[in-house]
Swiss-Prot record:
Its cofactor is Mg(2+); Mn(2+). Its EC number is 3.1.3.16. It is an enzyme of class 3 (hydrolase). This is Serine/threonine-protein phosphatase T. GO terms for molecular function: metal ion binding; protein serine/threonine phosphatase activity. Gene3D superfamilies: 3.60.21.10, Tetratricopeptide repeat domain. Induction: Expression peaks in early log phase and decreases dramatically during the stationary phase (at protein level). The gene is PPT1. Interacts (via TPR repeats) with HSP82 (via C-terminal MEEVD pentapeptide).
Length: 513
């Protein structure tokens, strides 16, 4: 480490202060650039690394945040903020034992810190649960019962929320197998009228459906998801009057989802929607978004589709708020049903044999094919490696080849990887989500890959647009320097106002900065 000149120290301090301004304005990517410039000028200052770690954390670059915290602590072992940020980065990477060590250091210096205390309790809970899973070995999976497919609706009949319910009504059919055992539920009268009343008379007024209704909706939707392959195939080449709209992360931003449908049109026989994962967590209306999507799936099974994202998983839901939101609004049992229904979601969608849509990105195996995706056994929690995990977690990078992920899970894949996969599988483009893009939709890797992100002003802080990709064969709108595909239309939308409830308002995990 070379000793910086006095002039470089002064310039570095200026860049750090500029980065701090961007952080206050919640422009975290710009802040990262300024902190990096400061570090390039003077790499002896612990605070520059811990500040950049904060900005990396805010854009989900958890591995990069952790690496910066390591350097900050090496330079200054008394940098308490760096310990806190490293602990939270470890939690995001599901490394709870490592996080607990840093939290204990923090609490030794600040015994009454409420956020650290809450985070430590969360770590302890995860560690206990992991010990329990290891203690029972494989018995858990062997004994796992599908709550959705064995649902007994009458078990909800005594609940007070049902007796007091005055909202729109649903009719249910209790299903049985050939041995007369409970086999889930079916909604007999799902309608646009019910969905509209559910949204306007309940959700927009801060009210909830009875738990019996929610359980039946989840069970019915789960049955539909289970009937779909791990890679769904959609086609509108032969029906050019049918639009397919591909949307990215929505993260519980219910009011923005409603605005999306208002702006781009409702689901119907002439308009198919595909939401590309991460529709829960972060935002504080994740239950409302999930129930709206599940109702739309029941009403329009051939025109509404969901891919699974990395946040449709148990560990993410425990950390980022969906489990706690479910428990607050409904019950642990309802969350468990949602969690099992997430295991039924497809992992990818192929449109017109041209466009492959997955939440994260391409697998690291160079021989991977579409047939491999079809054959993935998806009915489980995502593993820590392999194509299943990579479809949910991988990110693109500008450099060729494979690289480490800034998130710490998955990997980064270069334009050569994308080009080879497209050629080998005779595809035009990859559509993926998983990362915020300020413009809502971004063409990357020489136009071979597109990232679509549909949560405008993400977490009430980023100021980004939301985006949508419409697949309209032969009727696209070309845009110089942007859209080069005659089959696509790119549109964006801004965030709308919502009640003053902060992101992750129901979370008890102590996960935040």
């Amino acid at each position: 480490m070379s000793t910086p000149t006095a002039a470089d120290r002064a310039k570095a301090l200026e860049r750090k202060n500029e980065g701090n301004v961007f952080v206050k304005e919640k422009h975290f990517l710009k802040a990262i650039e300024k902190y990096t410039e400061a570090i390039d000028l003077d790499s002896t200052q612990s605070i520059y690394f811990s500040n950049r770690a904060f900005a990396h954390f805010k854009v989900d670059n958890f591995q990069s945040a952790l690496n910066d915290c390591d350097e900050a602590i090496k330079l200054d072992p008394k940098n308490i903020k760096a310990y806190h940020r490293r602990a939270l980065s470890c939690m995001a990477l599901l490394e709870f034992k490592k996080a607990r060590k840093d939290l204990n250091v923090l609490l030794k210096a600040k015994p009454n810190d409420p956020a650290a205390t809450k985070a430590l309790l969360t770590c302890d809970r995860f560690i206990r649960e992991e010990r329990f899973r290891k203690a029972i070995g494989g018995a858990e999976n062997e004994a796992k019962i599908s709550l959705c497919q064995t649902l007994n609706l009458s078990s909800f009949d005594a609940n007070a929320d049902l007796a007091n319910y005055e909202g729109p009504k649903l009719e249910f059919e209790q299903l049985y197998d050939d041995k007369n055992a409970f086999k889930g539920a079916k909604i007999k009268n799902m309608s646009q009228e019910f969905i509209s009343k559910m949204v306007n008379d309940l959700f927009l007024k801060g009210k909830y459906l009875p738990k019996k209704y929610v359980a039946a909706i989840i069970s019915h939707a789960d049955t539909l998801f289970r009937q779909e392959p791990s890679m769904v195939e959609l086609e509108n080449n032969s029906t050019p009057d049918v639009k397919i709209s591909v949307c990215g992360d929505t993260h519980g931003q219910f009011y923005d989802v409603l605005n999306l449908f208002r702006k781009f049109g409702k689901v119907g026989p002439k308009h198919t929607y595909l939401f590309n994962g991460d529709f829960v967590d972060r935002g504080s209306w994740s239950c409302e978004v999930a129930l709206l999507f599940y109702c739309l799936k029941i009403l329009h099974p051939n025109n509404f589709f969901l891919n699974r994202g990395n946040h449709e998983s148990d560990n993410m839901n425990k950390i980022y708020g969906f489990e706690d939101e479910c428990k607050y609004k409904y019950s642990q049992r309802i969350f468990n049903m949602f969690a099992q229904s997430f295991e039924s979601l497809p992992l990818a969608t192929l449109i017109n044999n041209d466009y492959l849509v997955m939440h994260g990105g391409l697998p690291s195996d160079p021989s991977a094919t579409l047939s491999d995706f079809k054959n993935i056994d998806r009915f489980a929690q995502p593993p820590r490696d392999g194509a299943f995990m990579e479809l949910l977690w991988a990110d693109p990078q500008e450099a060729n080849g494979m690289g480490p992920s800034q998130r710490g899970l998955g990997h980064a894949f270069g334009p050569d990887i994308t080009d080879r996969f497209l050629r080998n599988n005779k595809l035009r483009k990859i559509f993926r989500s998983h990362e915020l893009r300020m413009g809502g939709v971004q063409f990357e890797q020489k136009g071979k890959l597109m990232t679509v992100f549909s949560a405008p002003n993400y977490c009430d802080s980023q100021g980004n647009l939301g985006g949508v990709i419409h697949v309209v064969p032969g009727h696209g709108i070309l845009q110089a320097g942007r859209n080069d595909d005659q089959n696509l239309i790119i549109e964006t939308f801004e965030a709308v106002e919502h009640p003053d409830i902060k992101p992750m308002a129901y979370s008890n995990g102590g996960f935040g900065l």
